[in-house]
């Protein structure tokens, strides 16, 4: 708590204003064979996670309007694939996103990322809830630099709508993204890259 107070005093960022974030810190293990009941942890940095509701579109045609896509992303996995989309709890999906952009703060703000599903694709008895990661680059047409960040999405409404149509909750979430890989190609590829996350309510935080 003391390190949080000190961090906020030296920063314009207030941690309690963020719904989600990544905490970077430092802990020193005591040099003893006895297990300590408490561990001191010093907060070094806090990175807020952008958070939004997942988009629920009726049709593939309405998806184009509800969640525009004007550019691919590089990937949704980091650290040589060891970090990929995951469930934070039963209603929140978190994913890393890497993309290319112009090295300019105003252009950075133009990039928007939406997670969307299409109701028309859900059939009775379905077990896979498919999401599309949509990247809108705005007016940024350059690919000078590589950037990655974390994004969180509230999927509660999508889960409820899925249950209405399928008659059950999904057992698997499938995230599809158009990816350019490490090249600087801005054209949206024809095929998707897919990521899967098992949806097990009992194994996630409530």
Regions found by a protein language model. Give the residues of each.
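Start-of-domain marker
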Residues: 1-46
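Hydrophobic residues positioned within well-ordered beta-strands of beta-sheet architectures
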Residues: 21-23, 95, 131, 151, ...
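Beta-sandwich strand segments
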Residues: 32-42, 143-145, 163, 183-192
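Short helix-loop boundary/capping segments
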Residues: 77-144
């Amino acid at each position: 708590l003391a390190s949080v107070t000190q961090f906020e005093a030296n920063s314009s960022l207030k941690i309690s204003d963020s719904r989600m974030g990544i905490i970077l810190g430092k802990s020193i293990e005591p040099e003893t064979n006895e297990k300590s009941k408490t561990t001191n942890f010093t907060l070094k940095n806090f990175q807020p996670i952008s958070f939004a509701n997942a988009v629920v579109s009726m049709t593939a045609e309405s998806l184009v309007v509800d969640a525009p896509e004007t550019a691919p992303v590089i990937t949704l996995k980091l650290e040589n694939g060891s970090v990929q989309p995951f469930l934070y709890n039963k209603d929140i999906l978190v994913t890393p996103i890497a993309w290319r952009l112009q090295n300019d703060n105003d252009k950075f703000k133009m990039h928007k990322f939406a997670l969307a599903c299409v109701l028309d694709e859900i059939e009775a008895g379905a077990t896979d809830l498919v999401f599309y990661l949509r990247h809108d680059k705005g007016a940024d047409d350059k690919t000078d630099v590589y950037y990655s960040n974390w994004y969180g999405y509230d999927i509660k409404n999508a889960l409820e709508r899925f249950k209405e149509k399928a008659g059950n909750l999904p057992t698997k979430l499938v995230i599809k993204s158009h990816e350019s890989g490490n090249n600087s190609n801005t054209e949206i590829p024809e095929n998707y890259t897919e990521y899967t996350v098992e949806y097990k309510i009992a194994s996630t935080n409530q």
